[in-house]
Amino acid sequence: MNEHQKLVNCTPYLYYFCPISHLPSILKIGILSRNEINQKNLLSEDWSNLAVQEYRSKTKAQLSNGNVDFIHNMVCTFFNPYNTTIYKGQQNIGPEYKSLSVVLVIDVKSLFLNNPNLAY
């Protein structure tokens, strides 16, 4: 069993949180990294914390192939749908949060079957 198969077995789903207003764009062109969204001028609504985004814009991470890249060149997903980002969203937006946001469930197995390069 290779590393990708082990990952899929341990983590069958990833979760992506965003304002529901982003869904048409996601359905049309997919989930993009923060830098791709900014380059294409697609950010119509932003609930993120500016201080956190500033920090992330300067932060790099090592990929599974050994390369290092800025995390804003990657898509931020979560292993658990109940996480700090969603908690903060609920806190900042208030009761209307449920009707304004969406958590997308991403099947990891389908991702790797359709594009094995995603691990890199």
Question: Language-model segments: which ranges?
Answer:
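Active-site-proximal loop/hinge segments that shape catalytic or ion-binding/gating pockets
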Residues: 1-76, 83-120
